[in-house]
Amino acid sequence: MQLRLSSGNVLNEKVHKVGIIALGSFLENHGAVLPIDTDIKIASYIALKASILTGAKFLGVVIPSTEYEYVKHGIHNKPEEVYSYMRFLINEGKKIGVEKFLIVNCHGGNILVESFLKDLEYEFDIKVEMINITFTHASTEEVSVGYIIGIAKADEETLKEHNNFEKYPEVGMVGLKEARENNKAIDKEAKVVKRFGVKLDKKLGEKILNNAIEKVVEKIKEMIR
C-alpha cells in the first residue's frame, strides 16, 4: 500500500519516522489542587500537542514510573519496569516505521531510566532522546500549568488548603524529611516553597506550557534535518 505521507499538516514526509512517547507518573500525591496523575497528564498534553503541530507520531504513554528511594509521595516501580514498557512501545513503533523516538518526561524520578536509552538504541538500531520538563513538586509552576490544561482545582479555598504543608507534606516536598536530607536541590526548593507558598499564576502557566511545547517541536525539527 502506497501511503500519502505528504498529506495533512506535517512538516515533511520525514516526520513520520519520528515517534513521541509521554512519560510521567500515575500514582503520586500532589496536594489538594492537583490530581495524582498530574505528571503523565502534563507530559501527554505537551507530547500530543507537539505531535499535532509537526505530524510526528504520538505513540502513547509509559504506564510505570520510578522514583528515588528516599522520595516517598506515591507508588512507583523499579527502573527496569519502566525500561521494559519503553522497550515494548519502541518495538511496536518500529513496526510502523518509526526510527527516531522522543520521550517527553514530566516526572523527576524518571531521570533514573536515562541510563537505559543507549541499550534501547543498540537493541533496536534506532535513535532515542529524552526531554525532561520537571517542576518543584505541586508548587506554583506545576499548579499554574495544571490550571491551564484544565486539571487543577485552584479556587481560593482549595489553594489555601493546598498550602497546609502538615496535611500535604508532598507539596514542594516541604514535609518530606528523608528526601530533603538526601537531596540538596530538593531541600533548596522546599525552603523556597515554605517561605513563599504556592500560588496560581495563569500567565506563568501559559508561558511554561508554550515554552515546553516549543522545545519539543524544535527537537522534532532537529531530528528530521
Swiss-Prot record:
Give binding positions for Fe cation 1: E28, D39, H107
Coiled-coil segments on the chain, per record: none
InterPro entries this protein is in? Creatininase-like_sf (IPR024087), Creatininase/forma_Hydrolase (IPR003785), FAPy_deformylase (IPR024901)
Family in the record: Belongs to the creatininase superfamily. FAPy deformylase family.
Cofactor note text:
Requires one Fe(2+) ion for activity.
Q: What is this protein's record name?
A: 2-amino-5-formylamino-6-ribosylaminopyrimidin-4(3H)-one 5'-monophosphate deformylase
Question: What does UniProt report on the pH dependence of this protein?
Answer: Optimum pH is 7-8. Has approximately 80% maximal activity at pH 6.5 and 40% activity at pH 8.5.
What does the protein in this record do?
Catalyzes the hydrolysis of the formamide of 2-amino-5-formylamino-6-ribosylamino-4(3H)-pyrimidinone 5'-monophosphate (FAPy) to form 2,5-diamino-6-ribosylamino-4(3H)-pyrimidinone 5'-phosphate (APy).
Please give the catalytic activity noted in the UniProt record.
Answer: 2-amino-5-formylamino-6-(5-phospho-D-ribosylamino)pyrimidin-4(3H)-one + H2O = 2,5-diamino-6-(1-D-ribosylamino)pyrimidin-4(3H)-one 5'-phosphate + formate + H(+)
Might you name a Gene Ontology BP term for this protein? F420-0 metabolic process
Query: Which UniProt keywords are listed?
Result: Hydrolase, Iron, Metal-binding, Zinc
> Which amino acid positions bind Fe cation 2, per UniProt?
H30, D39
Provide the organism lineage as a comma list.
Answer: Archaea, Methanobacteriati, Methanobacteriota, Methanomada group, Methanococci
What is any Pfam family matched here?
Creatininase
Q: Which domain of life is it from?
A: Archaea
Q: Which pathway does it serve? A: Cofactor biosynthesis; coenzyme F420 biosynthesis; Cofactor biosynthesis; riboflavin biosynthesis
| Assembly information from the UniProt record | Homodimer.
Provide the GO MF annotations for this entry: 2-amino-5-formylamino-6-(5-phosphoribosylamino)pyrimidin-4(3H)-one formate-lyase activity; ferrous iron binding; hydrolase activity, acting on carbon-nitrogen (but not peptide) bonds, in linear amides; protein homodimerization activity
Q: What is its EC number?
A: 3.5.1.102
Cofactor(s) required for function per UniProt: Fe(2+); Zn(2+)
